[in-house]
């Protein structure tokens, strides 16, 4: 088998025996096939391997050309938040529930992975979002998001008054529990649950979805991914926060605003050649079967 990848990182958070077996089987299979393998520290401790090459996520990003993430979409998102800063490709073996991103089936994972490792794969460059909390155009706090940036309050079901500017032009004002700003990758997640549209992964688009708006006319808004979004708040607003992929939370203080824009970094996600985005949607969302 011709090696299109030479150094492979194994990433995951095994929480049950079947996941541990998948990690160990993958590790032994890669070693047997002559690959240099780095395995994340926490995974190596769980597997109790004999003198493996261990590494942090950052080291895997620096030294490996492919990372195999074993787990659900949450595990892949967590790993990708670090690995997206490096020139490394990522593929996922699903050990979670949905598996929109981690799409390899554990039962056929090694067969499909063998095809990928021989160069028979497709590459998707999924763009990220930069979220910046600013005070007079000076960045106070920032983070990235692969799925979505969510404006919300510290307390549940508290209304927020805010204004949305797109490319320095006033777009709309809103009284709502919050706002979801989603990438195409995130459009099948939290955004979809809030009534947002599904955006094909290849589109250069961002969707803004109000959360429980205090009006009947509020609708999701789809804009070009090159647009810069600014959220402004009245001075009476308190306890405001933005959440990036439900993993990083940034506090918004009095007098601060939020800028959200397309990041210069990408999630380099790869799939077997047989991967079909719309077939995945049909399967995961239980859409109707073909009539003929």
Curated annotation (Swiss-Prot):
Any Pfam family hit: NAD_kinase
Cofactor(s) needed by this chain: a divalent metal cation
Secretion signal span: none
Ligand binding (NAD(+)): 73-74, 147-148, 158, 175, 177, 188-193, 247
Catalytic residues as annotated in Swiss-Prot or TrEMBL: 73 (proton acceptor)
Entry EC number(s): 2.7.1.23
GO cellular component: cytoplasm
Subcellular compartments: Cytoplasm
Enzyme class: transferase
Record's keyword terms, sorted: ATP-binding, Cytoplasm, Kinase, NAD, NADP, Nucleotide-binding, Transferase
InterPro entries to which the protein is assigned, alphabetical: ATP-NAD_kinase_N (IPR017438), ATP-NAD_kinase_PpnK-typ_C (IPR017437), NAD/diacylglycerol_kinase_sf (IPR016064), NADK (IPR002504)
Domain of life: Bacteria
Catalyses which reaction(s): NAD(+) + ATP = ADP + NADP(+) + H(+)
Molecular function via GO: ATP binding; metal ion binding; NAD binding; NAD+ kinase activity
Any one GO biological process: NAD metabolic process
Major subcellular site: cytoplasm
HAMAP family the record matches: NAD_kinase
Task performed by this protein: Involved in the regulation of the intracellular balance of NAD and NADP, and is a key enzyme in the biosynthesis of NADP. Catalyzes specifically the phosphorylation on 2'-hydroxyl of the adenosine moiety of NAD to yield NADP.
Family membership noted in the UniProt record: Belongs to the NAD kinase family.
Identification of the protein by name: NAD kinase
Organism: Buchnera aphidicola subsp. Acyrthosiphon pisum (strain APS) (Acyrthosiphon pisum symbiotic bacterium)
Gene from which the chain derives: nadK
């Amino acid at each position: 088998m011709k090696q299109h990848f030479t150094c492979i990182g194994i990433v995951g958070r095994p929480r049950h025996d079947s996941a541990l077996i998948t990690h160990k089987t993958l590790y032994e299979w890669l070693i047997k096939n002559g690959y240099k393998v780095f395995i994340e520290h926490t995974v190596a401790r769980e597997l109790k391997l004999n003198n493996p090459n261990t590494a942090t996520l950052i080291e895997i990003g620096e030294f490996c050309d492919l990372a195999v993430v074993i787990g659900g979409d949450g595990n892949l998102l967590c790993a990708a938040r670090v690995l997206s800063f490096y020139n490394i490709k990522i593929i996922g073996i699903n050990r979670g529930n949905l598996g929109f991103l981690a799409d390899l089936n554990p039962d056929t994972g090694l067969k499909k992975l063998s095809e990928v490792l021989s160069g028979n794969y497709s590459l998707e460059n999924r763009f990220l979002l930069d979220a910046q909390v600013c005070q007079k155009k000076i960045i106070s706090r920032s983070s990235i998001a692969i799925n979505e940036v969510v404006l919300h309050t510290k307390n549940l079901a508290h209304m927020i008054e805010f204004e949305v500017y797109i490319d320095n032009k006033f777009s709309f004002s809103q009284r709502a529990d919050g706002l979801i700003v989603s990438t195409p990758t995130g459009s099948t997640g939290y955004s979809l649950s809030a009534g947002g549209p599904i955006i094909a992964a290849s589109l250069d688009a961002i969707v803004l979805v109000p959360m429980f708006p205090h009006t009947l006319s509020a609708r999701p808004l789809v804009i070009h991914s090159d647009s810069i979004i600014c959220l402004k708040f009245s001075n009476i607003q308190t306890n405001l926060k933005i959440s990036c992929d439900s993993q990083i939370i940034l506090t918004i203080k009095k007098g601060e605003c939020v800028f959200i824009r397309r990041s210069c970094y990408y999630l380099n996600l790869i799939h077997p050649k047989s991967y079909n985005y719309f077939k995945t949607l049909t399967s995961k969302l239980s859409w109707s079967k073909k009539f003929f």
